[in-house]
């Protein structure tokens, strides 16, 4: 499988809150904004991630900004830890954060609560990051607060399922097609001219 390159940036949300970063892919200056509330243990989020990588970013990455938000569902035993780990990797390198998110989603059937830290340490080591620091980051209150901030923002916007994707404020919930998002993005791009 070939991955297309997308512009990745991170932007601090507030000074002093460790890990409080918004992970953005695509054109960060675009007037058209896609906000993605995701759970890294969610099968529908894994399907959406493939759509994002294979269709949305190649077609819209130069024209639209895609912003990731963490929304770990309580029923998923390791989703919150995965969100915290993704925030840790984001502080190391935004591209590594995207790689970790892809990894967690692609390997969600092999990862479980019992082996989560072992899998996290192996991922870190494979990507040149100190495994002990990656595992220790799971206890970082700043990273946890950043995940919680995203979660509470999602709750305030009515998010209860993942993925929930907002295209310029209009929600697409859990299962939707590329064609539905493409139509909304095309209309938003025309309106933004």
What are these regions (language model features)?
Residues 33, 63-65, 164:
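Residues at or immediately flanking beta-strands
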Residues 6-16:
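Bacterial N-terminal signal peptides
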Residues 37-39, 50, 121-193:
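C-terminal cap of thioredoxin/glutaredoxin-like
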Residues 1-4:
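Positively charged n-region of N-terminal signal peptides that target proteins for export
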Residues 15-19, 158-161:
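A short, compositionally biased
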Residues 27-30, 58-61, 78, 156-160:
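Extracellular/periplasmic catalytic domains that process cell-envelope and extracellular macromolecules
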Residues 38-40, 46-125, 191:
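Structural alpha/beta surface segment adjacent to cysteine/selenocysteine redox centers
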Residues 19-32:
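A short beta-strand-turn-helix
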């Amino acid at each position: 499988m070939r991955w297309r390159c997308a512009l990745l940036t991170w932007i601090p949300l507030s000074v002093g809150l460790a890990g409080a970063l918004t992970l953005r892919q695509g054109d960060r200056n675009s007037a058209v904004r896609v906000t993605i509330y995701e759970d890294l243990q969610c099968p529908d989020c894994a399907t959406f991630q493939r759509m994002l990588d294979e269709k949305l970013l190649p077609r819209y990455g130069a024209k639209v900004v895609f912003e990731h938000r963490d929304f770990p569902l309580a029923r998923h035993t390791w989703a919150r830890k995965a969100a915290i780990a993704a925030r840790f990797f984001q502080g190391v390198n935004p591209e590594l954060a995207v790689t970790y998110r892809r990894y967690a989603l692609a390997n969600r059937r092999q990862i479980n609560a019992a082996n989560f830290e072992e899998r996290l340490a192996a991922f870190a080591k494979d990507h040149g990051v100190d495994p002990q620091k990656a595992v220790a980051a799971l206890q970082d209150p700043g990273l946890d607060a950043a995940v919680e901030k995203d979660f509470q923002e999602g709750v305030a916007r009515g998010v209860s399922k993942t993925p929930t994707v907002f295209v310029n404020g209009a929600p697409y919930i859990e299962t939707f097609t590329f064609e539905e998002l493409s139509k909304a993005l095309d209309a938003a791009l025309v309106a933004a001219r």
